[in-house]
UniProtKB/Swiss-Prot annotation:
Protein location: Membrane
GO molecular function annotations of the record: carbohydrate:proton symporter activity
Organism: Neurospora crassa (strain ATCC 24698 / 74-OR23-1A / CBS 708.71 / DSM 1257 / FGSC 987)
Primary localisation category: membrane
Taxonomic placement: Eukaryota, Fungi, Dikarya, Ascomycota, Pezizomycotina
Membrane side Extracellular: residue ranges: 48-74, 120-131, 182-195, 307-327, 374-389, 457-458
Protein name (Swiss-Prot/TrEMBL): MFS-type transporter qa-x
């Protein structure tokens, strides 16, 4: 098996894997660059000497300062939570593409408002207000982009294409982690020093806004809304095939069958998917989607993203430049491992297996770091020039090892699974629910991490280590492997028990349905579909 080998659900023309589908995914993923940058830059910006001086952080007690910092960080997640819910409405009425335009505009307005903050008259309030709006923008985008990409993607590369969304997150995070190291080492601690990191937010948002005018609407959304002629044109453009090509004919028939089934079972309309929540199978998938983000945030990732100076100080790293440098290296490691996950792991190794490995390895690393802090108490050394002990160096090694386990597993895989596990009629609502869960747990972590470090110290690491172990049990018993399964077959996947064998059994069913003998018997049906397609266009 080669590095980029693909496991196809049916014979697929090479033309399907073309630059158009990758380019559309990349443009939509400017949204994740926004999210990654905002998640990464804020923690180190709050530690910039120019920022702490302008807003007089020295006048606060430790508890009051922790509360202020957590509020600045967490209002963004609160806005994102509601942005996810708003996205369900915009997705239904406006479509995927126009929703991306709308949420990029909201983000741009929020980022611009933040630039009005100062240490005198306006104070820090514009930053808080702007981060609420920016949060609404990224919350909506975090809902929309995985859906949009999954609906464009051929099944064999769906994980890889949704993974571009995760790659964009890491590119934004990499810039966010390093930018404050750059301004801190090259600029005087003036107002301009901290304004630059806030202003950079406008770049990915502007690129998403402009790019969204070029990318097409999701063909699945167009079919669901009765715009068949436009949908056919978009689908043929994305697949780089003619309307009469057998692959296009089959894909249209799959989409039509899926829409017909859910029109019959759930019904069309804005409120109909809410009524489908009465069904146990739908409730179960919503629960699974939300729990994936509970376990993801339970790994400790967002405590590190938002409060990296605090995290590294607890290990024994002192000095602003050193803390920023260590944070920047953390961003580089995440970026490299995300590329490995994107190109190989997610579509070849599968979703379940990499979640197992990531949780087990990450938990061991957290146990070691917590034990080191309990025994050595490195945080008690307040000297700026304090050197790391051999135990501290080992703790740093295990921190980066934890990053190596977490990044190619829990970082992006929950987004991939949630983008593909819901049916057409509940996909927007399901993704909204999953993304809202992500931002809810994100909010909890960002709001209480400073207080947790004050009260629990080393216990914070034991807490995250325990949650990672529990996630293994949950995934093993409750989550089926979704790799290579067509979106139209997801319902069947979640019906098969036990979940450990569901993917294997369903792929065998799909291959049986499409074996040569059955293909011959269905050839007349395909000819009829070709004729119908020709008439449609």
């Amino acid at each position: 098996m080669t590095l980029l080998a693909l496991k196809e659900d049916r014979p697929t023309p090479k033309a399907v894997y073309n630059w158009r589908v990758y380019t559309c995914a990349a443009i939509a993923s400017f949204a994740s660059c926004m999210i990654g940058y905002d998640s990464a830059f804020i923690g180190t910006t709050l530690a910039l000497p120019s920022f702490t001086k302008e807003f007089d952080f020295a006048s606060y007690t430790p508890g009051a300062l922790a509360l202020l910092q957590s509020n600045i960080v967490s209002v963004y997640q609160a806005g994102a939570f509601f942005g996810c819910l708003f996205a369900y409405a915009t997705s239904y009425f406006l479509g995927r593409r126009k929703s991306l335009i709308a949420f990029s505009v909201v983000f741009i307005i929020g980022a611009a408002i933040m630039l009005a903050a100062d240490g005198q008259g306006r104070g820090i309030d514009p930053i808080i207000a702007g981060r609420v709006l920016a949060g609404i923008g990224v919350g909506g985008a975090s809902n929309m982009v995985p859906i949009y990409i999954s609906e464009l993607a051929p099944p064999a590369v769906r994980g890889r294409l949704v993974g571009i969304y995760e790659l964009g997150w890491q590119i934004g995070g990499l810039v966010g982690f390093w930018i404050n190291y750059g301004v801190n080492t090259t600029m005087a601690p003036t107002r301009s020093q901290w304004l630059i990191p806030f202003a950079v937010q406008l770049i990915p948002a502007g690129l998403l806004f402009l790019g969204s005018f070029w990318i097409p609407e999701s063909p699945r959304w167009l079919y669901a809304n009765g715009k068949r002629e436009e949908a056919m044109k978009v689908l043929c453009w994305i697949r780089n095939l003619e309307p009469t090509d057998r692959y296009i004919v089959q894909e249209v028939s799959f989409i039509d069958a899926d829409l017909e089934r859910y029109t019959r079972q759930v019904g069309n309309g804005f409120w109909k998917p809410f009524l489908s929540l009465k069904q146990r199978k739908v409730q179960w998938r919503f629960f699974l989607g939300g729990m994936l983000f509970f376990w993801q945030n339970g790994s400790g990732i967002n405590a590190i993203n938002y409060y990296s100076p605090t995290v590294f100080r607890s290990i024994g790293i002192t000095g602003t430049d050193t803390g920023f440098l260590t944070t920047g290296i953390f961003g580089v490691v995440k970026m490299v491992l995300t590329i490995i996950w994107l190109l190989w792991l997610v579509d070849l190794v599968g979703r379940r297996r990499i979640l197992f490995i990531g949780a087990a390895g990450g938990s061991l690393c957290m146990w070691f770091i917590g034990a080191y802090i309990k025994i050595a108490d490195p945080g008690s050394n307040k000297a700026e020039d304090a050197k790391l002990t051999s135990g501290g160096i080992a703790a740093i090694f295990f921190f980066y090892l934890w990053t190596a386990f977490y990044t190619p597993s829990w970082n992006g895989t929950p987004w991939v699974i949630n983008s593909e596990m819901f049916d057409q009629n509940t996909r927007s609502l399901g993704q909204a629910s999953a993304a809202a869960n992500n931002w809810f747990w994100n909010f909890i972590i960002s709001r209480f991490t400073p207080q947790m470090f004050i009260k629990m110290e080393y216990g914070v690491y034991f807490f995250f280590a325990s949650l990672m172990l529990l996630s293994i049990v949950f995934i093993y018993f409750f989550l089926p492997e979704t790799k290579s399964i067509p979106l139209e077959a997801m319902d069947r996947l979640f019906e098969i028990k036990p979940v450990q064998n569901a993917n294997k059994n369903l792929m065998a069913e799909l291959n049986f349905d499409r074996n040569p003998e059955r293909e011959e018997s269905s050839s007349l049906d395909d000819k009829d579909r070709v004729t119908q397609t020709e008439n449609a266009v």
